[in-house]
Amino acid sequence: MIHMLNAAAYRVKWTRSGAAKRAACLVAAAYALKTLYPIIGKRLKQPGHRKAKAEAYSPAENREILHCTEIICKKPAPGLNAAFFKQLLELRKILFPKLVTTETGWLCLHSVALISRTFLSIYVAGLDGKIVKSIVEKKPRTFIIKLIKWLMIAIPATFVNSAIRYLECKLALAFRTRLVDHAYETYFANQTYYKVINMDGRLANPDQSLTEDIMMFSQSVAHLYSNLTKPILDVILTSYTLIRTATSRGASPIGPTLLAGLVVYATAKVLKACSPKFGSLVAEEAHRKGYLRYVHSRIIANVEEIAFYRGHKVEMKQLQKCYKALAYQMNLILSKRLWYIMIEQFLMKYVWSSCGLIMVAIPIITATGFADGDLEDGPKQAMVSDRTEAFTTARNLLASGADAIERIMSSYKEITELAGYTARVYNMFWVFDEVKRGIYKRTVTQEPENHSKRGGNLELPLSDTLAIKGTVIDVDHGIICENVPIITPAGEVVASRLNFKVEEGMHLLITGPNGCGKSSLFRILSGLWPVYEGVLYKPPPQHMFYIPQRPYMSLGSLRDQVIYPDSADDMREKGYTDQDLERILHSVHLYHIVQREGGWDAVMDWKDVLSGGEKQRMGMARMFYHKPKYALLDECTSAVSIDVEGKIFQAAIGAGISLLSITHRPSLWKYHTHLLQFDGEGGWRFEQLDTAIRLTLSEEKQKLESQLAGIPKMQQRLNELCKILGEDSVLKTIQTAEKTS
C-alpha cells in the first residue's frame, strides 16, 4: 500500500501526505454513497410500482380483509403531517383549558429560564474572548479579574441549568396531571369504562393508554418545548451578535451567512431523506407493550383456572411470544437509530465544524478593522490580541449557534416519536368521546357469505354500525318494554321485540336456557347496553340495584363492603349508623363476620377473606342498605342455603322492593308473581306465575327425566340376558313385526 501511494504521488506530483488524505476522502465518500444510495433510491421509487408489486405477490385469500382493517390502513401513519398538528391542537385544549392555569405559569417560568440561559451563553462567550486577550497581552491582573468574573457568573449559570431541568419535569407532571384528570372524568362518565371494553373494539388496552402513553406524551411535549425554544433563541441572538460584531469591524457577513444557510439546508434535506418513520415505529412499540401487559393481567385474573388445568407452559409460550415481538420492535428501532445517528453526527459535528472555522476565519481575515500592515510593533501586538479575542468570541458564539441548530434538527426524530404518542393519546380520547355518545365500533371476524346462521341472528355488513334508534325514558314508577330487542355487542339478536310491564309490588321470575338473553336484559335495564329499537321506560339508576352471581369486593374496610358504592360520608348523610348496618347484616345472616374480622374498620382483601356464600349475602346486604325500588338479581344466592335464601327474599319483599330474579331454584318461585320465559330461539312469553301448577309440572318433568335416564342401562342389561339365554327379546319380535307390517 505504501509503495502504491508513493508511486501515485510521484506520478501526479502530489506529496505523500496529500495522497493519503485524498485516499481517505475517497474511502469516506464511497462508504457514504453505499450507505445513502439505498435509502435515497427507496425514497425515489414510484408508489404505484410498490403497490402493484405488493398486489402481485399477495395471496388471494389475504385480499379479502375486513372493512374495519381497511379503515385503519387508510389513516395516515403517525408522523410530521397535518393530522399530527390537528391532533396536537385538540390536545392543547385539554392542556390549557383557559389562559390562566397552573400549566401556563410553569410554562412562563420555563421560558424565562431558557431565555436567561441564552443571554448567559452570549455573555460567557464574550468573557472567554476577553480572558484569552488578557493572556495574549500578558496582563495577569486583568486575567485574574476576568477569571473571577467567569467563576462568579458560573453560580447563576448552574442555577439556571438546574432550574431548566426542574421546570421541564414540573411542566411534564402538570401536563400529565391535566390529561389524567380529563381522561378519568371521561373514562368513568356514562359507564364508558365498561362500554369501551365490552361494546367497542378500537382500544385493545385502555390501561396502557391511560398510564404509559399519557406519561410518554407529557414528557415528550415538555422536553421538546425545551429542546426547541432555547435553540431557536440561541440561533437568533448569536446570529445577531455575530453579524453586529463583523459589521463593526468592517467585514461583510453575507458570505458566511450564505455558507451557513447552504450547509444547514443541505444537512436538513439529507437527514430528512435518511430518517426512518420513528412515529410509526414508536406507536407500534407502545402497542406491543400494552399487549404484553394485557397478557400478564389476563394470567393474573385467571391464575386459579390456569393452575387447575396445569396450563403454565401454554401461558409461558404466549408471554414469550409477546415479549419476543416487543424485543424485535425495540431492536428494530435501535438499529435504525444507530445508522441515523451516525449520519447525523458526521454531518453536524465534523462537516459543520469545518464550515464553522471557515465562517469565523473569513470575517477576521477580510475585516478592515484588523489591518496591521503599516503599524509598528506595539500597535501590531494590540491588533493580534484583538484578533484573538474576536476569534475566541466568534468561535464560542458560533459553536453555541451550531449546537442550537444541531438540536433543532435532531428534534425531528423526537417530533416523529411525539407524533406516535400523540396519535395514541388522541385516539384514546376520541374513542372515549364516541363511546360516551353511544357510537360503538367493533373489530370482528368477517364470516363467509354462505355461512348459515340460526334464525335469531341479525346479519349486518361490517362496513356499517348498528344504528341506535331506541329511546330510554326515566319514569318514577314501573319498568315498561315496548318492542325492545335484545342485541349483543356483536350484532346478534337473541330476543326480538320484548313487550312487558313490571309495576311496583310485582316480582318477576326470568327463566330460559343458557345464552337466551336473561342477563342481557339486565344489562339493557342497567344502561350498559343500548336500546337499538323500541322504547324503554325505567326508573332512574338510583332506584335500581343489580346484584350479580359473584359480587365485587372493593378495597377498603368492612363498612365499605356493605355500603358500596357509597363512602362513609355518604352513609352519614343518608342517616345510617353502624347499628343500622348491624341490623342489615342480621337480616342476611352475616353479622358474625363483624366480630370475626375485627370490627367495621377492619381493612382486608375481602375477595379472599369471605367465602362464596358470604360474598353473595354481602351483595344482598347492599340491596337492603340502598333500598331500591327494583332489584335485579342474577342468580345472586346460588351459593346460599335454601332456608337462608328464602328468609332473605321474604325480607326483601317485606321491605317493598320489587324483585326481578334469574334463578334455577324452584324453592324461590313462590316469591314471584309473574314469569318472563325465553325459549332460546329468539322467542319469549310473559304471563302471571301460578306457582302451584309450575311446581307440579316441574315435579313431573323431574320424574320423567329420572325414568328416562334408566332406559339405556335397562336396554343394555336386556341385551346381555338375551345373549346368555340364547333367546330373542319380546320387544325385538314386536319391533320386527311392526317393520314388516
Swiss-Prot record:
Glycosylation sites: N190, N227
Tissue-specific expression: Strongly expressed in brain and adrenals, and weakly expressed in liver.
Keywords: ATP-binding, Glycoprotein, Hydrolase, Lipid metabolism, Membrane, Nucleotide-binding, Peroxisome, Phosphoprotein, Translocase, Transmembrane, Transmembrane helix, Transport
PROSITE patterns recorded: ABC_TM1F, ABC_TRANSPORTER_1, ABC_TRANSPORTER_2
Pfam short name (any one): ABC_membrane_2
EC number: 3.1.2.-, 7.6.2.-
GO BP annotations listed: alpha-linolenic acid metabolic process; fatty acid beta-oxidation; fatty acid biosynthetic process; fatty acid derivative biosynthetic process; linoleic acid metabolic process; long-chain fatty acid biosynthetic process; myelin maintenance; negative regulation of cytokine production involved in inflammatory response
Assigned protein family: Belongs to the ABC transporter superfamily. ABCD family. Peroxisomal fatty acyl CoA transporter (TC 3.A.1.203) subfamily.
Protein name: ATP-binding cassette sub-family D member 2
Organism: Mus musculus
